[in-house]
């Protein structure tokens, strides 16, 4: 038995990556949770999108696959949660993935960090937009690194 609140995921906003932004403000698909005001955020409330649809939050994730920061896993292990260091969970990430590098080799996928043959297809965006390229160039100009694989060795950068 599967128990989930919300309706089925027939809404096209769920199945089109650009529709992601609309799911963030739609109470029919999002529980609309927010943090309490925090001093470190200028006393703002920060949205915590949680899916109110069959599939839960996975249905409103913009079709992105982003692993947690390795330091977070290592912190869990250091706090006594054996088996939860990044090195411990990495084999499971690899087993779950079917990573598709770009045909032209213009990516930074490290075979030691990614898997092939798993049920979760992970691929670089195939369609490039000039505006995105300009954003990345601007970020590099002011010192941010360009990161072609944010599930790789580091998640820092654009």
Identify the function of each model-found stretch.
Residues 1-158:
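N-terminal redox-cofactor-binding region of secreted/periplasmic oxidoreductases
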């Amino acid at each position: 038995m599967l128990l989930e609140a919300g309706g089925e995921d027939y809404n096209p906003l769920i199945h089109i990556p650009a529709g992601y932004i609309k799911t963030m403000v739609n109470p029919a698909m999002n529980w609309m949770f927010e943090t309490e005001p925090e001093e470190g955020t200028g006393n703002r409330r920060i949205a915590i999108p949680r899916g109110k649809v069959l599939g839960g939050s996975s249905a409103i994730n913009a079709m992105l696959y982003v692993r947690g920061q390795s330091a977070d896993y290592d912190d869990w292990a250091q706090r006594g949660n054996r088996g939860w260091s990044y090195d411990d969970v990495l084999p499971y990430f690899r087993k779950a993935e079917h990573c598709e590098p770009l045909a032209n080799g213009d990516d930074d996928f490290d075979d030691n960090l990614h898997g092939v043959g798993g049920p979760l297809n992970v691929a670089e965006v195939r369609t490039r937009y000039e505006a995105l390229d300009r954003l990345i160039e601007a970020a590099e100009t002011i010192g941010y690194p360009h990161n072609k694989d944010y599930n790789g060795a580091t998640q820092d950068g654009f």
